[in-house]
């Protein structure tokens, strides 16, 4: 969905800022939601790093009524497990 794509892009942007990285968002592969004083989104996404496509998992916490959005976690998915 558009909302999930936006959250995935947000996750990549935040990761890039924090890590001084240059990941380019590709596409959302999978997503799960959990309700926790807002919503926790677990987004599996593809991003490109220096021309190499990899899969990452992002955890984004959203509280829309507070206009709050925070990247909780961002990590590469081990190719062996996918």
From Swiss-Prot:
Keywords, alphabetical: Protease inhibitor, Thiol protease inhibitor
Single GO molecular function: cysteine-type endopeptidase inhibitor activity
Pfam families, A to Z: SQAPI (PF16845)
SUPFAM superfamilies linked: Cystatin/monellin
Disulfide bonds: none
Gene3D superfamilies: 3.10.450.10
InterPro entries registered for this protein in UniProt: Cystatin, Cystatin_dom, Cystatin_sf, Prot_inh_cystat_CS
Biological function: Strong inhibitor of papain and ficin but poor inhibitor of cathepsin H, B and L.
Family per record: Belongs to the cystatin family.
Protein name (Swiss-Prot/TrEMBL): Cysteine proteinase inhibitor A
Lineage of producing organism: Eukaryota, Viridiplantae, Streptophyta, Embryophyta, Tracheophyta
């Amino acid at each position: 969905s558009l909302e999930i794509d936006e959250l995935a892009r947000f996750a990549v942007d935040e990761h890039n800022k924090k890590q001084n990285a240059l990941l380019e968002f590709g596409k959302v592969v999978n997503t799960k939601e959990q309700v926790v004083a807002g919503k926790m989104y677990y987004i599996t996404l593809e991003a490109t790093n220096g021309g190499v496509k990899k899969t990452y998992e992002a955890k984004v916490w959203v509280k829309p009524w507070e206009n709050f959005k925070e990247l909780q976690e961002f990590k590469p998915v081990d190719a062996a497990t996918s």
